[in-house]
């Protein structure tokens, strides 16, 4: 006979408790005990409860290997319960044979209906560390089960592959939004839709009467940053600053030679550059920068309210004056092929010509941001990381424990996006000039160009030559966060991988990397994505990239959407007239006629309001309430990571006090651990 204390912790979320009966059996090196019911007087397993149970085992099972948890309905059905599956969220189990000698079994899973969970003691183990056949068999069975539950599908040819579920109703509770998060998202969507519907804006297919009328819509859920955008959107300095610190801060690059198809001359830009210099001198000095939206050339366009929509493929040349002067646009060409019907617009042109040219650039920024930077890089690729993690890494694996907080809710939000945003006839088709067809074109085109280095911030900054451009807060804050993540990951890797050989010998890790390469990057070797990792250094870089992409990168390109776009002329989602082919034609009336119709603008506002802020149940970067790591060494690393993020946040907030428009999107407490909205 053997006696032990079993302590059980139930989650605090709404619906986490259960009326079902829970039993456990203990698996050890000498065998497995019979199922032992966990019950006492009163109700067990209420939400938020931690409960102790004294159990007696008929035999000694030897060294404990696993805990088998069994849940079944009560023998006597309770009123109103017989028609539903009673789910239970278990946080952890603890076994104590002697006082002070407890074994901890992390769980942090939902168990729906009648079923069974197998839990291992919390110490993380790489596959080559498991020598007992029972543990080896458990790892394999766990992965086989998850690979059946979470399978791949091709949603659109040429896109990264994704989860093979049609709707969020099909998802199991372990990858689904919490009840609170779901309710808040629904309330947000419903309130936004109702307000705009009552105002009649969703049914108006015509033009806005004036910018002043747009201003009245702008009163919808204002923010301080959005107010700043409204006040400064026409200014050249603000236009340029958005390439650095707006929602698409990843395109600008230093220009050392002008493209052949962008024939800017000294005469054109002399009024901006001033005396005593030239284009060639500024190119050699490194003070010119280029933003090229050429990927949009010839892209599919949409039809809205029965009218064809239009897109441009502009190139924008910007100049950084010496000293502390602002970055300014000095030339814009709206199409890729130069010619008499493709003028180069200049700041010295008529006010409305120049404003219209800048607005076409902003429309192109919107398309590339939403389709490529946001949807592809910050949603579809993180979904690949999430799905491969669930399919190839068992829960006891140190990299599963490290990554699971960073894939929370990603499969839910992406499944919801395929239902409500990118499906034919949904929000993207209702509000944007490219529609789902154009978005699909852009994603396919970028997938053919996408390189591993683009996903690694330090390499991307170097490749674009923007290491020293002043006022680039996305770079400054992002590099600090990248460094903090890399230091944290390096410590975790050093704990579990003593050598490069140990990385090479981890077959679960290698299967994970191969699956990301084959399913996410479609086996394209030119992407530079690894299909195997053979050193600790390569592993640290790869995991840092994954965590940064799922957290900071997503925050940088997602959190500011409402701020930047709610004043629609700053980032119009469509253009109703073609790009101008000559100068001197733009007027206030033609500017308004080019902008989106009222209903398209309004549907766009609904999408922005939904996608810009987390609807509750948030977990900021480095906040890990689910304690998957139980050993002292990784817990110390987590604490050090959290302290570093606090220091970074203090520095960002101190800097922001001196800025007219604070850059907050990479302040660590405002970064979500995962792609969850």
Swiss-Prot record:
GO terms for biological process: arachidonate metabolic process; cannabinoid biosynthetic process; endocannabinoid signaling pathway; linoleic acid metabolic process; lipid oxidation; lipoxin A4 biosynthetic process; lipoxygenase pathway; negative regulation of cell cycle. It catalyses: (9Z,12Z)-octadecadienoate + O2 = (9S)-hydroperoxy-(10E,12Z)-octadecadienoate; (5Z,8Z,11Z,14Z)-eicosatetraenoate + O2 = (8S)-hydroperoxy-(5Z,9E,11Z,14Z)-eicosatetraenoate; (15S)-hydroperoxy-(5Z,8Z,11Z,13E)-eicosatetraenoate + O2 = (8S,15S)-dihydroperoxy-(5Z,9E,11Z,13E)-eicosatetraenoate; (8S)-hydroperoxy-(5Z,9E,11Z,14Z)-eicosatetraenoate + O2 = (8S,15S)-dihydroperoxy-(5Z,9E,11Z,13E)-eicosatetraenoate. Expressed in epidermis and brain. No expression found in heart, spleen, liver, skeletal muscle, kidney or testis. It is found in: Cytoplasm, Cytosol; Membrane. It is a peripheral membrane protein. Changing residue 536 to Q: In clones G2, G5 and G11. One of its GO terms (molecular function) is linoleate 13S-lipoxygenase activity. Fe cation binds at residues 374, 379, 554, 677. Changing residue 558 to A/H/N: Retains catalytic activity indicating it is not required for iron ligand-binding. Residues 2-125 form the PLAT domain. Pathway: Lipid metabolism; hydroperoxy eicosatetraenoic acid biosynthesis. Binds 1 Fe cation per subunit. GO terms for cellular component: adherens junction; cytoskeleton; cytosol; focal adhesion; plasma membrane. Coiled coil: none annotated. Ca(2+) 2 binds at residues 39-40, 42, 44. Its cofactor is Fe cation. The PLAT domain can bind calcium ions; this promotes association with membranes. Belongs to the lipoxygenase family. This is Polyunsaturated fatty acid lipoxygenase ALOX8.
